[in-house]
Design a protein with these regions (language model features):
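Vicinal oxygen chelate
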Residues: 2-13, 16, 30-34, 39-46, 59-84, 102-107, ...
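Short amphipathic alpha-helices in soluble, non-transmembrane regions
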Residues: 23-24, 82-87
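Short beta-turn/strand-loop junction motif enriched in small, turn-promoting residues
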Residues: 27-28, 58
Length: 118
């Protein structure tokens, strides 16, 4: 039996700080308020490798580097970095692997790291 990703869960201190950012960043996602602790955003159309993202409200703020992060792809890394900065993300660094692989490390408005590549 194989497992599949049901949803990705991101801890947050304030739903209203991170959810508007992630909804804009991901595009055609809709919000589903589960309760005070959990809010999910999910693609309007399910499938195509776009799992729902659940935000779990936690009392503590982020204090260290994420042990797991999202690797997101767009048509232009440079354009996506600028777009996401305009939405409230922070650019952390650009990384390369060899001559042909590069990505940008970024953080959402609460400091949760993610990467952007082409």
């Amino acid at each position: 039996m194989a497992l599949r990703v049901g949803e990705i869960v991101i801890d947050c201190a304030d739903h209203e700080t991170v959810i508007p950012f992630w909804m804009e960043a991901m595009g055609d996602y809709v919000r589903h308020d589960v309760n005070e602790q959990f809010v999910t955003i999910a693609p309007r159309e399910r499938g195509a490798g776009r799992p729902p993202i659940m935000f779990q409200k936690v009392p503590e703020r982020k204090t260290a580097k994420n042990r797991v992060h999202l690797d997101l792809r767009g048509e232009s890394m440079t354009a996506e970095v600028e777009r996401l900065k305009g939405l409230g993300a922070t650019f952390i660094a650009e990384r390369t692997l060899g001559e042909s692989t590069r990505w940008a490390v970024m953080a959402d408005p609460e400091g949760n790291e993610f990467c952007i590549s082409e």
